[in-house]
């Protein structure tokens, strides 16, 4: 992609993930060109990439819509992520060295410093950034470029669902404290190199958002 189309791709992807464009909403080219101040060519290139990533669908070979969301897809993606991450934790514990341990500890500390505040996009962005960095630090010890690429793909597929969960938890003091407790327990198991416990904790940790997302999707 060109630099211009890459910008369009990033902006549109971010808007879809955050729900600024709703599932099944038609993406009118006139609206997109106005919103992003980009030409039709770069936007078509950006849309084609988002079709490949299953965030956008083609309508009658001439238009585009935001991809739909469903409970079945939610369960499938999150189950795949949880099992993939659990496997990567096992490999990371077996292969990671002292520098890996130090990085996990540092990222866990940075994440623990965040506390719930006002319902701002900045808070969500900062939490998500540190949360991703923490999880990435853990699995980085596996040392497999290809497995990490597969993990990143699953992460992207889960992004819209994750953002629903983020809005419902990060801005809640009680829920945020529970998440901090989970992260501390997980970090301790990883650094103790307790493979079985760390893997199961990671799997359960990544499955916990499901009920919250289901409630939100049901309008509760």
Curated annotation (Swiss-Prot):
Residue ranges constituting the HTH gntR-type domain according to the UniProt record: 1-69
Superkingdom in the source lineage: Bacteria
Summary of activators and inhibitors of this protein: The repressive effect at the glaH promoter site is specifically relieved upon glutarate binding.
Residue ranges of the annotated DNA-binding region, renumbered to this chain: 29-48
Subcellular localization, as worded in the UniProt entry: Cytoplasm
One GO CC annotation: cytoplasm
GO function term, MF aspect, one: DNA-binding transcription factor activity
Keywords noted in UniProt: Cytoplasm, DNA-binding, Repressor, Transcription, Transcription regulation
Chief place where the protein resides: cytoplasm
One Pfam family linked to the record: FCD
Gene Ontology biological process terms, A to Z: negative regulation of DNA-templated transcription initiation; regulation of DNA-templated transcription
Job description of the protein: Negatively regulates the expression of the glaH-lhgD-gabDTP operon in a temporal manner during entry into stationary phase or during the first few hours of carbon starvation. Thereby is involved in the regulation of a L-lysine degradation pathway that proceeds via cadaverine, glutarate and L-2-hydroxyglutarate. Binds to two primary and two secondary sites in the promoter region of the glaH operon with the consensus sequences TTGTN5TTTT and ATGTN5TTTT of the primary sites, each separated by six nucleotides.
Protein name: HTH-type transcriptional repressor GlaR
Gene name of the encoded protein: glaR
């Amino acid at each position: 992609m060109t630099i211009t189309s890459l910008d369009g791709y990033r902006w549109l992807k971010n808007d879809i993930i955050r729900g600024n464009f709703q599932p099944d909403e038609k993406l009118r080219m006139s609206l997109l060109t106005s919103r992003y101040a980009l030409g039709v060519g770069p936007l078509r290139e950006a849309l084609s990439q988002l079709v490949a990533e299953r965030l956008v669908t083609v309508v009658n070979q001439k238009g585009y819509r935001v991809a739909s969301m469903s409970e079945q897809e939610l369960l499938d993606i999150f189950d795949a992520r949880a099992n993939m991450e659990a496997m990567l934790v096992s490999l990371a514990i077996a292969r990671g060295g002292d520098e890996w341990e130090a990085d996990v500890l540092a990222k866990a500390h940075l994440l623990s410093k965040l506390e719930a505040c006002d319902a701002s996009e900045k808070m969500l962005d900062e939490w998500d950034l540190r949360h991703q960095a923490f999880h990435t630090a853990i699995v980085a010890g596996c040392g497999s470029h290809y497995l990490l690429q597969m993990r990143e793909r699953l992460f992207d597929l889960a992004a819209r669902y994750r953002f629903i969960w983020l809005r419902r938890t990060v801005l809640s003091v009680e829920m945020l404290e529970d998440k901090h407790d989970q992260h501390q327990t997980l970090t301790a198991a990883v650094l103790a190199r307790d493979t079985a416990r760390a893997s199961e904790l990671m799997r359960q940790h990544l499955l916990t958002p499901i009920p919250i997302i289901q409630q939100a999707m049901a309008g509760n």
